[in-house]
């Protein structure tokens, strides 16, 4: 179902934890990720990949993106060469991390509204933590988050629920009063296993139709995040219990 455009209610959001995926949810990172992948493919004498093909590969971390990218280019990564290529890719990407990337429309206003309502905000991403912080810093978004937990800072990466639970714990939150906002099957699976409701955006990088991923609520615009979180916290009996 799709969220209704309600007026955010501070008492429901106050003290709740809203955990966000990064790539394809908060920020449209595909342009710089695609460019970085195609640069390293060119260095290896391989043809570039179409933008839309690579866009669907984003969200599982740098190593997974390289593995899928090289396979799609017809040269599956050899286990011995993978570490050096991943390191090279990360260096290339860090050098252009926000050249063409930017927050999706409505992100800043929604984050401001959520913080004003007393919610605890965190980033739960399969991106490496230092890359995530560098991206958020470059886009002036770090100020809105109480914690940034990349795959390398968690016991295991999404879809393992421990990633989401560690993110909630990092802000002193309670899984019983939390929402996961994402765009992919990894977000949906991690949240389901952690018993946290999932809000999925329809404009992200998922390969499968977002309607098939098992999210509790879908939104077409980021401006609907505050009202959708209220809906989920209320319908799941997770509203502010007099805190």
Give residue spans per PLM region.
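Substrate-recognition element of Asp-dependent hydrolases with the DxDx(T/V) motif
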Residues: 25, 37, 107-137
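Residue-level detector of anion-binding/catalytic polar loops
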Residues: 47, 120, 197
């Amino acid at each position: 179902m799709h969220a209704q455009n309600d007026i955010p209610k501070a008492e429901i959001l106050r003290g709740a934890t809203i955990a966000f995926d990064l790539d394809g949810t908060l920020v449209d990172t595909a342009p710089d990720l695609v460019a970085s992948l195609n640069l390293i493919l060119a260095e290896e004498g391989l043809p570039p990949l179409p933008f839309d093909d690579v866009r669907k590969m984003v969200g599982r971390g740098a190593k997974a993106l390289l593995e899928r990218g090289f396979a799609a280019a017809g040269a599956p990564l050899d286990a011995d060469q993978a570490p050096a290529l991943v390191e090279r890719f990360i260096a290339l990407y860090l050098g252009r991390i926000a050249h063409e990337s930017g927050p999706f429309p409505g992100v800043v206003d929604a984050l401001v509204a959520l913080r004003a309502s007393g919610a605890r905000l965190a980033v739960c991403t399969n991106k490496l933590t230092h890359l995530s912080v560098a991206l958020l810093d470059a886009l002036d978004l770090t100020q809105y988050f109480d914690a940034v937990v990349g795959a390398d800072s968690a016991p295991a990466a999404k879809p393992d629920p421990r990633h989401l639970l560690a993110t909630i714990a990092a802000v002193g939150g309670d899984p019983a009063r939390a929402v996961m906002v994402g765009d992919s099957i990894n977000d949906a699976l991690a949240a389901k296993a952690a018993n946290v409701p999932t809000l999925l955006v329809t404009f992200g990088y998922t390969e499968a139709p977002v309607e098939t991923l098992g999210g509790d609520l879908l939104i077409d615009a980021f401006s609907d995040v505050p009202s959708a979180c209220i809906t989920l916290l209320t319908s799941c009996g997770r509203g502010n219990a007099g805190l």
